[in-house]
């Protein structure tokens, strides 16, 4: 019962964040990454405890792209 409530709360949060995100239309790279990570977390919670056992798996290209994007994210954060 509590797990169902948590999943529904995450879905509501995701829906609200996507609604705000589509209103802005100019998401920055970091914001897109945060939304993608939130969606992945919601999917793992919805799939149950077996999804947490193996842990998240990233392909090499995803790891390289995320590492290459770090300086841009840090630079954007420094401008705020």
UniProtKB/Swiss-Prot annotation:
Keywords: Amidation, Cleavage on pair of basic residues, Hormone, Neurotransmitter, Secreted, Signal. It comes from the Eukaryota. The keyword Signal applies. The modification Alanine amide is found at residue 77. It holds the Pfam family Pigment_DH. GO terms for cellular component: extracellular region; synapse. It is found in: Secreted. Residues 1-23 form the signal peptide. The keyword Signal applies. GO terms for molecular function: hormone activity. Eyestalk. One of its GO terms (biological process) is response to light stimulus. The function of PDH precursor-related peptide is unknown. The sequence is not well-conserved among different species and that might be an indication that it is inactive. The pigment-dispersing hormone causes the migration of the distal retinal pigment into the proximal end of the pigment chromatophore cells and thus decreases the amount of light entering the retinulas. May also function as a neurotransmitter and/or neuromodulator. Belongs to the arthropod PDH family. This is Pigment-dispersing hormone type 2. It comes from Penaeus vannamei.
